């Protein structure tokens, strides 16, 4: 390798390293909150639904649905993220909310980190009679927070007639 090629390569490498360091510093300034990586290893659920931790209060999906529904008739299911309003800013937000009826996906809404919104979604659901042969079905909601991972909440619904 000649001297000129060596100097050119060394200079470009040094510049790239400097840019990378500057980009990392800018990212650190813009995204000051560190994410707890252990929250991304599994599906997070409330350890004790009667006594939620501050983290659980902001992240466990809360499902509001009738206790009893009639098969084949539409009803409303509201899914909110936590009992406490979750921030929706550029550094901390809910990416999506989804609802499953039993093991079947029913709907999913993608969220955007634009301002301080109240992440809450309303679904209109119809449960076919054959979907709940035992007369009960579980509604399962999931949400994903960019800093605190994937969270789940569920509620059982009685299905009649």
Which residue ranges define each predicted feature?
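Short coil-to-beta strand junction motifs in C2/discoidin
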Residues: 89-95
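Short acidic/polar inter-strand loop motif in beta-rich domains
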Residues: 144-154
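Exposed aromatic-hydrophobic patches
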Residues: 119-128, 154
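C-terminal segment of N-terminal export signals and the immediately downstream linker at the start
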Residues: 20-63
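Short amphipathic, basic-aromatic surface patches that mediate peripheral association
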Residues: 80-89
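Structural beta-strand segments of beta-rich domains
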Residues: 73-77
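N-terminal export signals
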Residues: 5-26
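Solvent-exposed serine/threonine-rich low-complexity stretches and specific carbohydrate-binding patches
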Residues: 105-114
